[in-house]
Amino acid sequence: MGKEKIHINIVVIGHVDSGKSTTTGHLIYKCGGIDKRTIEKFEKEAQEMGKGSFKYAWVLDKLKAERERGITIDIALWKFETAKYYVTIIDAPGHRDFIKNMITGTSQADCAVLIVAAGTGEFEAGISKNGQTREHALLAFTLGVKQLIVGVNKMDSSEPPYSEARYEEIKKEVSSYIKKIGYNPAAVAFVPISGWHGDNMLEPSTNMPWFKGWKVERKEGNADGKTLIDALDAILPPARPTDKALRLPLQDVYKIGGIGTVPVGRVETGVLKPGTVVVFAPANITTEVKSVEMHHEALQEAVPGDNVGFNVKNVSVKELRRGYVAGDSKANPPKGAADFTAQVIVLNHPGQIANGYTPVLDCHTAHIACKFAEIKEKVDRRSGKTTEENPKFIKSGDAAIVNLVPSKPLCVEAFQEFPPLGRFAVRDMRQTVAVGVIKAVNFKDASGGKVTKAAEKATKGKK
C-alpha cells in the first residue's frame, strides 16, 4: 500500500448556473467513490426520465436530494482521488445551508474551486453586482480559504466554441476582482474546461490546442499543469495544527451502558490523549479522559481532523452539552467569553442592524443568541480601514467592527489563534444574514467550576 495519501478538503463555489454540479459530478464519477452499481442505477433512471444524455449533474442531484432529506449518504460519494490526494468536497453551494456550513463547517476547506461559465452573457450574470460569484469568493477569503483554483467552464458553448479570446477575457476580469478581494492571481490556476464534455478535466483537451497549460507562482514553490485534476494535485498540503493548545467542540454527548459519559466531537487543534485532564468550557468542568475512540477503535492520540468519542469519569450527561469546548486544563485551557469583538460582514438583511440587535450566532458547534452591544465602526471590506465611527446602523453589504455579548455562556476564540472557533454565521429569519471573524475575546474568570475526583487523582498522581 505504501503511505496513505493526504486528505484535503475543497469547497466548490460559483454562480447558480455555472455548471458546478456537472463539473463536480464529473470528478466524482470519473475518479471517485461512486460504485458501478449506483451509477448503473442512476443511468437507468436518467434514461427512463428522458434525461438520457445522463448529465453528471444527475449524480450530484441524486446525492444532494438524499443529503437534504437527511439521509446520511455514504460520505465516500463526495470523495475522489488525484495522484497525490484524497479529496473531499465538503459542500457545494445550492445546498440550502451552504453559507452556514462553510462557516461552522466540520472542516475548513483547504482550497476553493471557483467555477465560472464562458457562455455568452452567462459569465456577466454571475459576476454582476447581484451574482453569487463575488459573494462566494469573498466568503471563502474572509473565512481563511487561502488557495483558489478557477475553472472557466462551458468552453464548448462560448462564441465561437472553445474560443481563446473569450477565455482570456474572462481570465482577465476574474483576476482583477479576486485581486480586489485579497487573492493573488499569480498564485491561482486558471483552467478552461467543459465539465460536461470533459475537456481539460482529467485529460488535456484536443479542442483547445491554444491552451498551453496553467502556471502558478508562490513562495512555497511554483507549479504548472494542463488540467483541472492537475491543479487539484498542486494544492499545497494543509498544515494540521497539532502544536496548538487542544480545542475540541462537542457535537453530542452520549451515555453508554457500562462505559459512562461519552462526549463526541472533532479535534480542531492540538492533541487529545487518554489520561489528559480536560476542562469543558464555558461550564468549567474538569475531569480525566479515560479513553479515546475513533470508528470503534481505541486511539493513543487524536489529532486535528479526527472525529472522536472519549470517555470521561464522574461527569453526567446532563452536565455537558453540544457547543461546549474541551481543552487541556493545564495548557492554555478554553474559557467562557464575557463578550467579544468581531468584524462582521452583512450579507442579506432586509432592514438595518442597530445596537441591541440579538440574532443567533452559529460558531463551531455552538448555537447561541448574542447581542450587538455596540457597533463601533464601519470598515472598508477590503482594506479594513475605518470609514465611519459609531454608525447608527449597518445594512447589507456593510462591514463593521462590533462588540457582541452572548445571552448564555459561550466559548469562542480569536480567529488568529484558533480559526475554527473564531468564525461565525449570524442567523435570523432562517437564513444567514451576516458572517463574522472574531478579533478579540474578553474571557470570564474561570474559577469555581466543578473538579471531579478523577481529575484530582490524576493531577496528584502526576506531581
From Swiss-Prot:
SUPFAM superfamilies per the UniProt record, alphabetical: EF-Tu/eEF-1alpha/eIF2-gamma C-terminal domain, P-loop containing nucleoside triphosphate hydrolases, Translation proteins
InterPro entries: EFTu-like_2, G_TR_CS, GTP-eEF1A_C, P-loop_NTPase, T_Tr_GTP-bd_dom, TRAFAC_GTPase_members, Transl_B-barrel_sf, Transl_elong_EF1A/Init_IF2_C
Disulfide bonds: none
UniProt-annotated stretches for the region G5: 194-196
GO molecular function, a single term: translation elongation factor activity
GO cellular component: cytoplasm
Main location: cytoplasm
G3: region residues: 91-94
Superkingdom of the organism of origin: Eukaryota
PTM sites of type 5-glutamyl glycerylphosphorylethanolamine: 301, 374
G2: region residues: 70-74
Record keywords: Cytoplasm, Elongation factor, GTP-binding, Nucleotide-binding, Phosphoprotein, Protein biosynthesis
Region annotation (G1) ranges: 14-21
Ranges for region G4: 153-156
Domain tr-type G: 5-242
Residues the entry annotates as binding GTP: 14-21, 91-95, 153-156
Subcellular location: Cytoplasm
Listed HAMAP family: EF_Tu_A
Recorded family membership: Belongs to the TRAFAC class translation factor GTPase superfamily. Classic translation factor GTPase family. EF-Tu/EF-1A subfamily.
PANTHER family, A to Z: TRANSLATION FACTOR
Its job: This protein promotes the GTP-dependent binding of aminoacyl-tRNA to the A-site of ribosomes during protein biosynthesis.
Name of this protein: Elongation factor 1-alpha 1
